[in-house]
Amino acid sequence: MNLRPEEISSIIRQQIDKYEAQVEVSDVGTVIQVGDGIARVYGLEDCMAAELLEFPGGTLGMALNLEEDNIGCVIMGPYTHIKEGDPVKRTGRIISVPVGDALIGRVVNPLGQPIDGKGPIKTEKYRPTERIAPGVITRKSVTVPLQTGLKAIDAMVPVGRGQRELIIGDRQTGKTAVAVDAIINQKGQDVICIYVAVGQKASTVAGVVQTLEAHGAMEYSIVVAANASEPAPLLYLAPYSGCAMGEEFMDNGKDVLIIYDDLSKQATAYREMSLLLRRPPGREAFPGDVFYLHSRLLERAARLAPEFGGGSITALPIIETQAGDVSAYIPTNVISITDGQIFLETDLFNSGQRPAISVGLSVSRVGGAAQIKAMKQVAGQLRLDLAQYRELAAFAQFGSDLDKATQARLNRGARTVQILKQGQYKPYPVEEQVVVIYTAVKGFLDDVELNKIGAFEDGFINFMRSNKADILKAIREQKEIKPETDAKLVAAIEEFKKTFA
C-alpha cells in the first residue's frame, strides 16, 4: 500500500484538528508517616475538615486533624500497602452516602456500598453524613405514638414519633431483642426502619437480618453494618451514615425508626482514633468532645412541623453498661441527651422476666403525650400497682402475718408482673395490649393461678380475635375505652373465664 506525501500530510492535519488538550489539575500531597490506620500527610494546604482523600490502590481516608504543617488522616480500609512518600489526592468531597428508596431491603457498609451480594444499588442521590440538626422553628412536639408491640414499653415507657429513647443494660439482657421487636411491629405502619450495627460480630448481624427477613420486615428496613473486624473510622462513621439515610425519608414527609446498636462501641472507636491522632485524653481516656459525638447525632432525630414536610426520625440508641453501672461516663452522657431510657436488668432477665425492663428506673420524658387514651386509661393504674407491689414485696420479706388487703395487693402485683412478660418476636397490636392489661388492673386475674396466667393471656387474645373482633376494632378506631366498649369488654372477659379452666 503506497501513501502519497499529500495524503500523509492530510491525515496528520486531521489528527491535529481532532486533538483536544486536557489538563487534569489535582491537589496532591505526600504521606510522611503511616501506621495503626492513621496517616500524616504533607502538602494539602486547602484540605477541608472531614474531606475524603484518595490513597494509592483506591483506599479512601478522611481528614480529621488539620495542623500547621500536616494533616492527620484516618484510613477507611486496608492500609498495609500504603508507605511513606506515597501520593495522596484530594477528592474535594465531604464524606457522603447514597440515599433513597433503592436502599430499602439492603445491607450496606457505612459508605453505602452493598455487602449483601444482591448487586449494585442504583441511586443518583447522595447526602453528607454530617448535617446540622433541625432548629426549634422547624420542629413539632411529639404527639403521635410509635408502638413497639411490647406491653411493658407501650404501657409504661411509651415512645412517640420523633423521640430519642435510650435502651440501656448489661450485655445479654435482651437490648437488641427489644429493638428488633420494635422493627417487626412497624409492619403495615408506614415507617421506614434503619438498623445500624456498630462493632457487632458479622454472625450476629447476619442473625438479625435473617430474623427481619423471616418476619417480612426487610421490605421496609435498611441495615447498616460496621462489623467488629472493620477499621475504627468505619465504626465511628456508621451511625451518621444511617442517620443521613433516614433524613432523606424524613425530609420527604415519612416516619423513620433508627436503632443504633450500640453507641458504646462507637465511642470506643472514636477514642481509639483520637488517641492515635494524639488528641488530649479526658475522663476514661475519652477525648473532650465525646459528648458532642453523640449529641450531634441524636439531636438529628426530630418531628418536623407540617410546613417543613411533617416527617420524623425516632431514635432508639443502645448503650451497654458494665455490671449495671449507669453512672459511668458514656451512659450518663447519653441519658442526659435522650428523652428517657428503658433500663434492662440482668437479675430480672435471669429470673425469667422478659423483656427485663426495670419499671422503677425506666422513664419516658415525652412519650406520655403520644400515648393513645385507651392505653392511658389502663396504664395509669398499672404503674401504681407495680410501684405498690415492689414496696410491699420488699416489706413482706420480713414478716409472714399480712392482712388481707396487703395479701390481695401482693397477689395482684405478681399477676401484673406476669402479664407483662412477652415472648420474643411476638409484638402485640396496641388494642390487644390494652385488653390484656385491662384484665390485670381491673382484678379479673386475681382468682387465676399464677402459673396459668400465660395460658390465660394466649387463650383470651385468641378468643377476642375470633369472637369479639368488634371490641378490638372499637378500641383501635376510637383510641379510647368508651363506657359501652367497657361494658362489652367486661362481659367478654367474664364469658372467657367461664370457658377457661
Curated annotation (Swiss-Prot):
PANTHER family: ATP SYNTHASE SUBUNIT ALPHA, MITOCHONDRIAL. The gene is atpA. Its EC number is 7.1.2.2. This is ATP synthase subunit alpha. CDD domains: ATP-synt_F1_alpha_C (cd18113), ATP-synt_F1_alpha_N (cd18116), F1-ATPase_alpha_CD (cd01132). The keyword Ion transport applies. It catalyses: ATP + H2O + 4 H(+)(in) = ADP + phosphate + 5 H(+)(out). It comes from Desulforamulus reducens (strain ATCC BAA-1160 / DSM 100696 / MI-1) (Desulfotomaculum reducens). ATP binds at residues 169-176.
